[in-house]
């Protein structure tokens, strides 16, 4: 590959920009504490995981053997026997959510998708793409789904086979919908467990809850039918990706034979990135579960540190249990742009992903927010 001098200069400028901002992130859930340099040599090859990793494919350059290992690992931490599960490495959380909703639609073809207003914005898009009826549910103050409103709307719609989109960590507040509560409430109105579907969006918290002492309900053992997690969030990856796991019996409904590649296919995308499979495989093989627990505990400790610092000066910051997302009043535009914060209405958040090895970046942000909010308060009262 030969670039012109101008293009070489442009790409060098971007390289330096990336170096400068490598660890910038405090407002979005992207861990940057990864090193996949041992895998760089594989970028010489076009590795394509088209089709089903458990079957033979006529496309020789695939990483199916590694994908099988990845899926066995996630079946274990999401508490489903490997032989009863199926899933794959996706292009990201949205594809995983679409896969779960697709399975649900094929199981209950004329049903409504119920999700809270704190759900990720992509779910409305998924409902349109899959041509599913959908219903937005109110949220509680902490970001959880409003269970009373959920049941009220299911009853109002006379829904016999609701499809529940459960958040295992909402985008803005890290709130976790109570899967067991949802099942209890549905049972109270006479809807049997076999008559509805629960998909769990665990984009960030899916790699937190398996490694804490007192996790909220999140797994197949707790009653879900499918779950997805992002690879570039808590795990960390230079390329966005994700993992989706579902019950094999439901996946078989959408499986088709593809003679072009001599294999079966049951994925959303056709060609799939074989390199991200290697990244996820290396990530799970290079750490023990004890090391993951220690990493998560550090992130949670940093989150509580941020809450304590805010609250010490009277700023009402908070976080949900087992969440590394710290919510606080939205500062001025100058501050949230300076620190690349995600904002929604009158709130902002910081996220203590694992590359925050000490409190320096957290302190820098908090100092600016305190100065900004306290200054605004003084101006409001006329000082």
Curated annotation (Swiss-Prot):
Please state the Enzyme Commission number of this protein.
4.1.1.22
Q: Any idea which positions bind substrate?
A: 120
Work out whether the entry's keyword set contains Lyase.
yes
Cofactor entry: pyridoxal 5'-phosphate
Q: Write the record's keywords in alphabetical order, separated by commas.
A: Decarboxylase, Lyase, Pyridoxal phosphate
Show the catalytic activity: L-histidine + H(+) = histamine + CO2
Question: Which InterPro entries does this one have?
Answer: Group_II_Decarboxylase, Hist_deCOase_bac, PyrdxlP-dep_de-COase, PyrdxlP-dep_Trfase, PyrdxlP-dep_Trfase_major, Pyridoxal-P_BS
One Pfam family per UniProt: Pyridoxal_deC
The enzyme's first-digit EC class, named in words, is lyase
Q: Name one GO molecular function term.
A: pyridoxal phosphate binding
* Residue list for modification N6-(pyridoxal phosphate)lysine: 233
Q: Where are the transmembrane segments?
A: none
What PROSITE patterns is this protein classified in?
Answer: DDC_GAD_HDC_YDC
The entry's family comment says: Belongs to the group II decarboxylase family.
**What HAMAP family does the database record attribute to this sequence?**
Pyridoxal_decarbox
What quaternary structure, including any partners, is listed in this protein's UniProt entry?
Homotetramer.
This chain's protein is named Histidine decarboxylase
Tell me which species this is from: Acinetobacter baumannii (strain AYE)
**Which lineage?**
Bacteria, Pseudomonadati, Pseudomonadota, Gammaproteobacteria, Moraxellales
């Amino acid at each position: 590959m030969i670039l012109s001098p101008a293009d070489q200069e442009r790409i060098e400028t971007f390289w330096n920009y990336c170096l400068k901002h490598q660890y910038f992130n405090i407002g979005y859930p992207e861990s940057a504490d990864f090193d996949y340099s041992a895998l760089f040599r594989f970028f010489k090859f076009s590795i394509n995981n088209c089709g089903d990793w458990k079957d033979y494919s006529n496309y020789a350059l695939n990483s199916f053997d590694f994908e099988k290992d990845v899926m066995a690992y996630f079946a274990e931490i999401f508490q489903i026997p490997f032989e009863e599960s199926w899933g794959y490495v996706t292009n990201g959380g949205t594809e995983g959510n679409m896969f779960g909703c697709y399975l649900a639609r094929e199981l209950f073809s004329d049903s409504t998708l119920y999700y809270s207003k704190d759900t990720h914005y992509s779910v409305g898009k998924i409902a349109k793409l899959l041509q599913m009826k959908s219903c937005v549910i109110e949220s509680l103050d902490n970001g959880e789904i409003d269970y009373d409103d959920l049941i009220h709307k299911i009853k109002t719609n006379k829904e016999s086979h609701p499809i529940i989109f459960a958040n295992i960590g909402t985008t803005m507040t890290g709130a976790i919908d109570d899967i067991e509560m949802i099942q209890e409430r549905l049972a109270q109105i006479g809807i049997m467990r076999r008559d509805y579907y629960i998909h769990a969006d665990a984009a960030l918290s899916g790699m937190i809850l398996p490694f804490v002492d007192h996790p909220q309900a999140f797994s197949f053992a707790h009653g879900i039918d499918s779950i997805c997690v992002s690879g570039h969030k808590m795990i960390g990856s230079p390329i966005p990706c994700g993992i989706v796991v579902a019950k094999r019996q439901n996946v078989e409904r959408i499986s088709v034979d593809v003679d072009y590649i001599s294999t079966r296919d049951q994925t959303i995308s056709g060609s799939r990135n074989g390199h991200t499979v290697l990244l996820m495989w290396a990530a799970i093989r290079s750490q023990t579960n004890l090391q993951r627990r220690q990493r998560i505990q550090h992130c949670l400790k940093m989150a509580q540190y941020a809450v304590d610092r805010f609250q010490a000066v009277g700023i009402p910051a908070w976080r949900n249990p087992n969440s590394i997302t710290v919510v606080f009043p939205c500062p001025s535009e100058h501050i949230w742009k300076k620190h690349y914060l995600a904002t929604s209405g009158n709130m902002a958040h910081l996220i203590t992903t694992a590359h925050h090895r000490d409190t320096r970046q957290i302190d820098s942000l908090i100092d600016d927010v305190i100065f900004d909010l306290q200054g605004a308060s003084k101006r409001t009262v006329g000082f």
